[in-house]
Amino acid sequence: VPASYGLEGLYRVSSAGTLVDLYLQSGSRTLELKPYGISSVATDRTMTPIVSNDFDAEGGLDVKYNLPKGLTADFTYNTDFAQVEADDEQVNLTRFNLVFPEKREFFLEGQGLFEFGGPERLLWGRPSNAPSVFFSRKIGLDSGHEIPLNLGGRLTGRLGKYTIGALNIQTGSANDIGVKSTNFSVVRLRRDILRRSTVGIIGTHRSVNLAGTGTNEVFGADASLAFLQNLSLTGFWVRSRTPGREGRDYSYRGRLENLGDRYGIEYEHLVVGEDFNPEIGFVRRRDFRRNYMQLQFTPRPTTPLIRKLRNELSFDYITTLDGRLESRQLRYLLAPEFQNGDEWWLEYNKDFEFLSTPFEIATDVVLPRGPYASESIYSAYHLGPQRPVNGWVGFIRGSFFGGTRTQIKYFGRIELSPILSVEPRISIDWINLPQGRFTSKLVIGSFNYTISPRSFFSALAQYNTSTESFSTNIRFRWEYEPGSDLFVVYTEGRQTDDRGFPILQNRGFVVKFTRLLRF
């Protein structure tokens, strides 16, 4: 399957082939060394003093050692992620923080072993309200700035019925943005019980908290119990410890699911205290109690057109811990799946939001404190992944914070050939509020070309009016030996708030060379 398909390649069975002359490394080799060398030229006009065509060269080392009984130890020195693809831009029309997925290889490996709470991932654009105790992007990144990773180690694997994950990272300081050298530690342990169930614990430690007043620790326990064929019960309890943030420094959740092919029900009770502060995790919102229920009915009509007809009715009710209503949503979804693999979504939402403080939704557009009720219709058509042109197109229309909102979206993939594809993504919001009118535009274009089974070229261009930015990211990768790579990366960011050609903010050119040695 060509690398240009990305994750969608998992579902492209028609493009699969037969492996011949496959060379497998000897399983007796327990030690892998991967040194790297990198040279770069960078310009950054947002720094003081301005950095212009600054040349740098350095190296580092990754080590992997396969221990007996299914455990793996990883060590990293002077870790570098220059070859990682840039984050996809997002538009935020809520008062809560956005979450960006992890893309760095070191943290992606074994990521599932450390999951607790959350998940932080998005489902069809709907963010989870559950906090994540460990969110790896809190290590080595601060407000978009890279922090040096000096040294790190990780232990992962299974010992009988136990799944083990331990991580320790020492980061350097970044005096220009006021970040101190910090040690991050995470320990995660799960045990299998019954047939398909687990119980576990987690602990995290940050040697210097964000306020610089001491340390930050988090301790928690969770369970996932599976009964019968579709019934499951999950839950967690977790508490943080930060100087000056005592009191409601806890979070807990209980969730019941019974999701069959025809009928389904979900119920969740979630609490996050106002002082809960996992500084190696991610919290979208604090000081709330959530009760959520969803009913699902999915018949399979005996018609030549429709494969199944999904009906979902959900109710989301969120209050502060003192009982004041903050958010409420009634949602109904009708989603027929057609025999050709296409889907059509038609969704009705009735929402209520209470703003406890004024909210600046856009530049010079501030929503006053108070209650806001709204209704909206969402319609989207999803083309099946087997089509040369696939993806989905969506439309939203309805009331919004005392005004109106109209949105159109297209996220797609155009397969020009088995080795060449283009992925356009367009999102435009027209917002009309009593406090002002504005239009938010997000345009992303991705180009992927598979040169050979061991090399590819990709380009990403993004334009976002919300952040007044235009950015590009161009990457070339050549795997000249199994596990050994050459990367060439060019990145550029420009500001678009002034008329005329976008003003250069930063630019970088990187060449990175890695060599895998097995013993």
Please give the residue ranges for each predicted region.
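Membrane-interacting alpha-helical segments
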Residues: 46-47, 432
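Exposed, low-structure sequence patches enriched in small/polar residues
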Residues: 148, 236-519
